[in-house]
Swiss-Prot record:
<feature type="binding site">
    <location>
        <position position="232"/>
    </location>
    <ligand>
        <name>ATP</name>
    </ligand>
</feature>
<dbReference type="Pfam" id="PF20974">
    <property type="entry name" value="tRNA-synt_1c_C2"/>
</dbReference>
<comment type="subunit">
    <text>Monomer.</text>
</comment>
<dbReference type="Pfam" id="PF03950">
    <property type="entry name" value="tRNA-synt_1c_C"/>
</dbReference>
<keyword id="KW-0547">Nucleotide-binding</keyword>
<feature type="short sequence motif" description="'HIGH' region">
    <location>
        <begin position="34"/>
        <end position="44"/>
    </location>
</feature>
<keyword id="KW-0030">Aminoacyl-tRNA synthetase</keyword>
<keyword id="KW-0963">Cytoplasm</keyword>
<protein>
    <recommendedName>
        <fullName>Glutamine--tRNA ligase</fullName>
        <ecNumber>6.1.1.18</ecNumber>
    </recommendedName>
</protein>
<dbReference type="GO" id="GO:0006424">
    <property type="term" value="P:glutamyl-tRNA aminoacylation"/>
</dbReference>
<dbReference type="InterPro" id="IPR001412">
    <property type="entry name" value="aa-tRNA-synth_I_CS"/>
</dbReference>
<dbReference type="InterPro" id="IPR020058">
    <property type="entry name" value="Glu/Gln-tRNA-synth_Ib_cat-dom"/>
</dbReference>
<feature type="short sequence motif" description="'KMSKS' region">
    <location>
        <begin position="269"/>
        <end position="273"/>
    </location>
</feature>
<dbReference type="InterPro" id="IPR049437">
    <property type="entry name" value="tRNA-synt_1c_C2"/>
</dbReference>
<feature type="binding site">
    <location>
        <position position="213"/>
    </location>
    <ligand>
        <name>L-glutamine</name>
    </ligand>
</feature>
<dbReference type="GO" id="GO:0006425">
    <property type="term" value="P:glutaminyl-tRNA aminoacylation"/>
</dbReference>
<dbReference type="InterPro" id="IPR000924">
    <property type="entry name" value="Glu/Gln-tRNA-synth"/>
</dbReference>
Length: 553
């Protein structure tokens, strides 16, 4: 059975299968074509997994990584490097070298001249406001530009002079000559080239005219031999222009554009423009902030690459627009970490426990499983001592029977250690508990109490003598509403508790936790060492997801 046989079926795969069976194509060639004007986000992950996944599944198939870099004003080499890094981290390899649309600028220019010579394009001198007015609306047809029927020779001359830098930005543009009465606004003599005196990260200052996306994209696909050009549904009304350009130039390859629904995720914003604003207003620290929906942000937060790929596989590929529950993504992350993350103990909101009947000069090295369901991971050693820390939420002076943790006058088991009983509390002047004095049953290490009494609760702990101080960053969704994109004012729907920072302790064995190393902190959640701020001298752990789904109400 081949990978194609086991891959989930969808309408795009059905089209590809039909094209292969009919002999229309012998080899499938796709591409992932981001614009380098920001970081990739979870929405891009769906396209990455689709395009590169097809190349992995079909025999001899290829997938290019191409940067659609036609707007030097917004693009940057740093974004190029970040995108490359994200695609690699997700586990994909592109065919051959990286491609850039700017690699084809000379050929694109020649194709533009061909259109002019065929009287399919003309140089227009309308300004931006006039162009909008002449275009009309969905309710009214447009009207021809006064420059639409200028002589071919004149347009050729002006276009050459545009390239030579003789005209100011906004004073001239090259437009396709299609149909100003078309019901599709994209076909009303769209702009093919505009003047931009801007430094380009690939071509430097060689060019001062730059092709528009709709002109560049289809030709780049054709030049690279792309068979199936896959894009999201907002490009559906661009397809007639895609086909028109290729039909009117001398190029053999005619890729087929196919649209699929974009990924919309609850409580998540994927507009690059709005994400830029969050950074500019210092609401978010950077593109890789763990609260961001970017691939690098999710990586820093601790999402495994495999869990993102699995999520994209589960949501599938359709033409139906919908919004996916954030819980679905978190479930994929949780399943991966449950199976693979080593266990450790961490106390995030510590209060000291003193075990009065334990020798103050004694410590014990206790053995604990690294993973309770995977013996192959082995064991770890944890230090037990007279003074330990427990989480403040794991103690109450009074509680009902449902509270299965430590209560004054009652017993609880310490994970991987002994049964203890709370005998006394010490408080400061503000009435806050500073110490809990307990006694332990020395016969209960790995055993139930010998007299048959039942101890139901189990809590985690960390030695107060051997530990590592740590900062814990507890993350929640950045927005309070399911659809933040619909909010008139983003500031009003920001979650003030999207990041809560706490300070506590972890087992001493975590002092050398590597960047992005994932752990299940028992009874607390899944965490990873921050890939920017954590070091042996200052441990910083990001909470990736809670232990359980909290979205069910």
């Amino acid at each position: 059975m081949t990978q194609v046989d086991t891959a989930p079926s969808n309408f795009i795969r059905n089209i590809i299968d039909s094209d292969l069976q009919s002999g229309k194509h012998q080899v499938i060639h796709t591409r992932f074509p981001p614009e380098p004007n920001g970081y990739l986000h979870i929405g891009h992950a769906k396209s990455i997994c689709l395009n590169f996944g097809l190349a992995e599944d079909y025999p001899n198939a290829l997938c290019n990584l191409r940067f659609d870099d036609t707007n030097p004003v917004k693009e940057d080499a740093d974004y190029v490097a970040a995108i490359e890094k994200d695609v690699r981290w997700l586990g994909f390899k592109w065919a051959g070298d990286i491609h850039y649309s700017s690699d084809y600028f000379e050929q694109l220019y020649d194709f533009a001249i061909e259109l002019i010579k065929k009287d399919k394009a003309y140089v227009c001198a309308l300004d931006a406001q006039q162009t909008r007015e002449y275009r009309g609306s969905l309710m009214t047809v447009g009207k021809d530009s006064p420059f639409r029927n200028r002589p071919i020779s004149e347009s050729l001359d002006l276009f050459a002079r545009m390239r030579a830098g003789e005209f100011a930005e906004g004073s001239m543009m090259l437009r396709a000559k299609i149909d100003m009465a078309s019901p599709n606004m994209k076909m009303r003599d769209p702009v093919l080239y505009r003047i931009r005196f801007a430094h380009h990260h690939q071509t430097g200052d060689k060019w001062c005219i730059y092709p528009m996306y709709d002109f560049t994209h289809c030709i780049s696909d054709a030049l690279e031999g792309i068979t199936h050009s896959l894009c999201t549904l907002e490009f559906e009304d661009h397809r007639p222009l895609y086909d028109w350009v290729l039909a009117n130039i001398s190029i053999a390859c005619k890729p087929r554009q196919i649209e699929f629904s974009r990924l919309n995720l609850q409580y998540t914003l994927t507009s690059k423009r709005k994400l830029h604003t969050l950074i500019e207003e210092k609401i978010i620290s950077a593109w890789d902030d763990p609260r961001m929906p970017t691939i690098s942000g999710m990586r820093r937060r601790g999402y495994p690459a495999a869990s993102i790929r699995e999520f994209c596989k589960r949501i599938g590929v359709t033409k139906q627009e919908n919004t996916v529950e954030l819980a679905s993504l978190e479930a994929c992350v949780r399943e991966n970490l449950e199976a693979n993350a080593p266990r450790a103990m961490a106390v995030i909101d510590p209060v000291k426990v003193i075990i009065s009947n334990y020798d103050e000069n004694k410590t014990e090295k206790l053995i604990a499983a690294i993973h309770p369901k995977d013996e192959s991971m082995g064991t770890r050693t944890v230090t037990f001592s007279r003074e330990i820390f427990i989480d403040r939420a794991d103690f109450r002076e009074e509680a009902n029977k449902k509270y299965k943790r430590l209560v004054l006058g009652k017993e609880v088991r310490l994970r991987n250690a002994y049964v203890i009983k709370a005998d006394q509390v010490i408080k400061n002047d503000a009435g806050e508990i500073t110490e809990i004095h307990c006694s332990y049953d020395p016969e209960t290490l790995g055993n139930n109490p010998t007299d048959g009494r039942k101890v139901k609760g189990v809590i985690h702990w960390v030695s107060a003598v051997e530990n590592q101080a740590a900062e814990f960053r507890i993350y929640e969704p950045l927005f309070l509403v399911e659809n933040p994109a619909a909010a008139e004012n983003i500031d009003e729907v920001l979650n003030p508790n999207a990041l809560v920072i706490k300070h506590g302790f972890v087992e001493s064995g975590l002092s050398d936790a590597l960047a992005e190393k994932a752990y299940q902190f028992e009874r607390e959640g899944y965490f990873c060492a921050d890939n920017k701020d954590s070091s042996p001298e200052r441990l910083v752990f990001n909470r990736t997801v809670a232990l359980r789904d909290s979205w069910g109400g």
